[in-house]
Regions:
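Acidic anion/phosphate-binding donor-loop and adjacent secondary structure
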Residues: 97-98, 132, 143-163
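Short N-terminal targeting/anchoring amphipathic segment
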Residues: 53-70, 84-86, 226
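Conserved donor-binding/catalytic core segment of Leloir-type glycosyltransferases
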Residues: 121, 157-175, 181-189
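Short hydrophobic beta-strand element within catalytic cores of glycosyltransferases
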Residues: 238, 247-250
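Short alpha-helical segment that forms part of, or immediately flanks, the ligand-binding pocket
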Residues: 215-216, 238-243, 257
Length: 265
């Protein structure tokens, strides 16, 4: 099959540092290739360019990984009428409607629940249930939970920092690092955005790691912390921590896909 994966066009794919959605798209394309399919990535914020690039080949399936592009789905279909089309929303507050107006998500969500033409690949069962509750067409809803690839991670059975906890993620209000920065033995890693009171000059902030550095050093730690106030489902970084052998401490929003009875969750 010839499959197109449409990214947001905000950062490069594969990402050099932060970028969970971009990492997932890259992993999808890689896995598709290993299964004998063609996984073509189109990653630009320019809607006209997306449509132009898609029109240059014949695709069997097109998966748009950015809900903001809902407004060009019909144009995409007009260039590829024989292809199956799907869209996924990676918006973290789908199940919190009070947040939608603040983020300009109202129109997007309205389209997602009224759309009866294209598949909506839900990133989590939590999102699926939210759409279902608001009467989205069930024949267009499919749950497609994201996983984490394990092959490239360096595994250390005995971590070099067993008493340290890593808080890995973009430094932003939603991830709430600023709330916990004063706690000893937590080290923070992630892209700094200057949107909270988080002190980037503190000793506990290690800066932003490259993707390659993350692969090598996540297992330096005994566990990972993520107490965000909204997530699509369980974030990729938590799944990466688990396959790397770390225990995790997470908020309810980051625990949707986890078995909370396990001793390391």
């Amino acid at each position: 099959m010839n499959i197109a994966l449409v990214g947001p066009g905000i950062i490069e794919i594969p990402p050099k540092g932060w970028g969970a959605v971009e990492s997932l798209i890259w992993d999808y394309a890689t896995e598709l290739g290993e299964l004998g399919h063609e996984g073509t990535i189109i990653n630009t914020p320019d809607r006209a360019q997306i449509i132009r690039e898609l029109s240059e080949e014949q695709y069997d399936f097109i998966h748009v990984h950015y809900d903001v592009f809902y407004d060009i789905m019909d144009y995409i279909w007009s260039t590829q009428p024989a292809a199956k089309l799907a869209i996924s929303s990676h918006y973290p507050y789908i199940d919190q409607p009070d947040r939608h107006p603040y983020d300009g998500y109202d129109k997007i969500y309205k389209w997602l629940i009224e759309n009866d033409k294209y598949y909506n690949f839900c990133i989590s069962y939590k999102d699926y249930e939210t759409y279902k509750k608001d009467n989205a067409p069930l024949n267009k809803l499919l749950v497609c939970p994201n996983g984490a690839q394990h092959r490239d991670y360096n595994f250390e059975e005995k971590p070099s920092k067993p008493d340290k906890t890593i808080y890995l993620g973009k430094i932003e209000p939603r991830k709430r690092q600023y709330v916990y920065q004063a706690i000893p033995d937590i080290e923070f890693v992630g892209h700094y955005t200057n949107t909270t009171s988080f002190d980037k000059d503190a000793k506990s902030y290690l800066g932003e790691w490259s993707h390659q550095h993350k692969l090598q050093h996540v297992t330096d730690y005994g566990n990972m912390l993520l107490l965000s106030d909204g997530e699509n489902g369980t974030p990729l970084v938590i799944k990466e921590a688990l396959i790397s052998g770390l225990g995790v401490v997470v908020s309810k929003y980051a625990a949707h896909d986890l078995d909370k009875s396990l001793p390391f969750v």
